[in-house]
């Protein structure tokens, strides 16, 4: 690995309960469940989708701030669609951005910045 490479490290451990994993990222610890397990915590797919949508929020807010675009708030909704016959794969992922404080042209440009990252 080169010095210009950033590595994000996450570790997951068995919990002793089928369908539940204990996870660690930096100094943060969290539980992820499988729908076939306890299904009390976020599921793996929900955590995956949250990573994508929260990336949209933080990247767009930072880019708007850095370029002087007056975003006053935003909401990103993401829906992952899977077949009941094969729920291990997403068939489609839809992402909707509601960005406040800007006109449609500015919002579309901000979303395009996210898409290109």
Task: Report each predicted region and the residues it spans.
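Extended beta-strand/beta-hairpin segments
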Residues: 1-50, 61-117
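Alpha-helical metal-binding/catalytic segments enriched in His/Glu/Asp
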Residues: 55-56
